């Protein structure tokens, strides 16, 4: 399996876009490129029963974040909402494309440096 570099980085604010935790957001604390997963702070917490060892004399129950597949998260990037003059056209079930909170990531070269940009707005991150 070929290891691919992710466009997401550690400490990025991300939004879960699919799966059990859809709609929740948090900060990336670790990225596992081999398994293509990310660990997001306070999301997908699991408990594990741990036996006492020579290094850890205390046994018990530990909680920690488990990985979420990298395709289920997107960079959180708030864009300005559209102002609608016509109330009949502003239906609550239909959200305009610019009102979404997440974006894809692209790259652009500025001043001989590779910079991450938000595809939705074109601004650098």
From Swiss-Prot:
It comes from Mycoplasma mobile (strain ATCC 43663 / 163K / NCTC 11711) (Mesomycoplasma mobile). GO terms for molecular function: rRNA binding; structural constituent of ribosome. Part of the 50S ribosomal subunit. One of two assembly initiator proteins, it binds directly to the 5'-end of the 23S rRNA, where it nucleates assembly of the 50S subunit. One of the proteins that surrounds the polypeptide exit tunnel on the outside of the subunit. It comes from the Bacteria. Keywords: Ribonucleoprotein, Ribosomal protein, RNA-binding, rRNA-binding. This is Large ribosomal subunit protein uL24. The lineage of its organism: Bacteria, Bacillati, Mycoplasmatota, Mycoplasmoidales, Metamycoplasmataceae. Belongs to the universal ribosomal protein uL24 family.
